[in-house]
């Protein structure tokens, strides 16, 4: 194959339809716009979101209330039940959880949540604990250290 053999792909060089050029041209008279109505007039078209005079969706829905949280803390969260698979007396940190494959994506500092049961004692180091998570870890014989 040489450069002069290269041809455009079939269907890629489609000609534009020439409308309103006489009846015999195929798209004459109304130029494919139908008989009458707003959409057949010149400069036609309504603005985006216009619903024909009906109250549009963006006006029917209430406005959002409140303010955005400015310096929001985004934590990497994990439940106590995920820590149950670790061996006893393990030091649990963000790095160790990632190495063990329990965490995949790290969004920020580690926060331990209290969903599930824990029976093995663990030494957990995290940026934050919920009250139930702290009580479950300490009830299992482990310790909680806030970084």
Curated annotation (Swiss-Prot):
Record-level GO cellular component terms: cytosolic large ribosomal subunit
SS bond list: none
Positions in coiled-coil regions: none
Key words, A-Z: Ribonucleoprotein, Ribosomal protein, RNA-binding, rRNA-binding
InterPro entries: Ribosomal_uL15, Ribosomal_uL15/eL18, Ribosomal_uL15/eL18_sf, Ribosomal_uL15_bac-type, Ribosomal_uL15_CS
Biological process, per Gene Ontology: translation
UniProt xrefs under PROSITE patterns: RIBOSOMAL_L15
GO MF terms, alphabetically ordered: rRNA binding; structural constituent of ribosome
Gene3D superfamilies: 3.100.10.10
Superkingdom field: Bacteria
Record region (Disordered): 1-57
Annotated Basic residues bias: 10-20
Subunit annotation: Part of the 50S ribosomal subunit.
Family statement: Belongs to the universal ribosomal protein uL15 family.
Function: Binds to the 23S rRNA.
Protein's name according to its UniProt entry: Large ribosomal subunit protein uL15
């Amino acid at each position: 194959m040489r450069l002069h053999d290269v041809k455009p792909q079939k269907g890629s060089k489609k000609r534009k339809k020439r409308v309103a050029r006489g009846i015999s041209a195929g798209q004459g008279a109304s130029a494919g716009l139908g008989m009458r109505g707003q959409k057949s007039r010149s400069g036609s078209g309504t603005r985006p979101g216009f619903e024909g005079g009906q109250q549009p969706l963006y006006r029917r829905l209430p406005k959002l209330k409140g303010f955005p949280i400015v310096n929001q803390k985004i934590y990497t969260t994990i439940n106590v039940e995920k820590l149950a698979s670790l061996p006893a007396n393990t030091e649990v940190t963000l790095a160790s959880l990632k190495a063990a494959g329990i965490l995949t994506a790290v969004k920020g500092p580690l926060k331990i949540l209290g969903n599930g049961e824990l029976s093995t004692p663990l030494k957990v180091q995290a940026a934050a604990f919920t009250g139930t998570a702290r009580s479950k870890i300490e009830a299992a014989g482990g310790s909680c250290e806030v970084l």
